[in-house]
Amino acid sequence: MFMGEYHHNLDSKGRLIIPAKFRDEIGEKMVFTRGMEGCIFGYPIEEWQKIEAKLAKLPLTKRSARKFTRLFYSGAMESEFDKQGRVNLTMTLKEHAALIKECVIVGVSNRIEIWSAERWNDFSEEANENYDDIAEDLDDIEL
């Protein structure tokens, strides 16, 4: 399970270090793709395979399913970590998440998320202001 918030910068070659705590759980490689709210989702291979199985069940006749899977897969990349624990994300993913220098890597249960520091700060500020309301909307799962 992934949890926590880590701050790292893209290096001069556009590579990003993934925290050792996450790498230990991930293994040698993972899949990155477009995430929601302008971030990047990163999945260990086993989790990615579960998502692939679910996406394969979406109806081809439904336009929203076609659009989503098209965007989700076209932005996806498999990546191995280099010896320093860095990944080299595609330009498509960096542009999607507006990654320029400062990044925030967040653990979210079965995935990691990579955010630009600016977008993460905006999201966190808004979410923290509405934390109780968000929790109330989820009351049916009985946290």
Swiss-Prot record:
Tree of life domain: Bacteria
Xref: InterPro entries: MraZ, MraZ_C, MraZ_dom, MraZ_N, MraZ_sf, SpoVT-AbrB_dom, SpoVT-AbrB_sf
CDD domains linked: MraZ_C, MraZ_N
Localization, UniProt: Cytoplasm, Nucleoid
A Pfam family matched in the record: MraZ
Every SpoVT-AbrB domain range: 5-47, 76-119
GO cellular component terms, semicolon-separated: cytoplasm; nucleoid
A GO BP annotation: negative regulation of DNA-templated transcription initiation
Main subcellular location: cytoplasm
GO MF terms held by the record: DNA-binding transcription factor activity; transcription cis-regulatory region binding
Keywords: Cytoplasm, DNA-binding, Repeat, Transcription, Transcription regulation
Assigned protein family: Belongs to the MraZ family.
NCBIfam families tied to this protein: division/cell wall cluster transcriptional repressor MraZ
PANTHER family: TRANSCRIPTIONAL REGULATOR MRAZ (PTHR34701:SF1)
Assembly behavior: Forms oligomers.
The protein's name: Transcriptional regulator MraZ
